[in-house]
Amino acid sequence: MSITVYSKPMCVQCDATYRALDKQGLDYTKVDLTEDPAALEFIKGLGYQQAPVVIAGEDHWSGYRPDLIKAAAQASAMGTARVVNA
């Protein structure tokens, strides 16, 4: 499962998200929204106004969500692209 964290500098929730992803042993890509205008527009297009925004497989969320990070680790271990069952 591919995981991308869209974040900004000096963001407490972003740092907490990185720590939780690291704790779960998940690989992820960081994108700094202050340096990538296209990424910022993409995130705004999804309806988000605050960082971090995490895209994990087919799912995405905003803010520090340890419950969804744990679900992402479980989904990754099972080889699925869905974090949340629809």
Protein language model regions, located:
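Surface-exposed charge patches
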Residues: R19, E41, A71
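Local sequence-structure signature of Cys/Sec-based thiol-disulfide redox active-site neighborhoods
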Residues: M1-Q24
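Short secondary-structure transition/capping segments
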Residues: L40-K44, Y64
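Thiol-based oxidoreductase modules, predominantly thioredoxin-like and allied folds used
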Residues: D27-A39, Y48-Q50
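ATP/adenylate-binding site constellation spanning eukaryotic-like Ser/Thr protein kinases
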Residues: K8, Y48, P66
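Structural micro-motif
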Residues: K44-V54
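Short alpha-helical
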Residues: V12, P37-A38, L68
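Non-catalytic, surface beta->alpha helical segment in thiol-disulfide oxidoreductase systems
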Residues: I55-V83
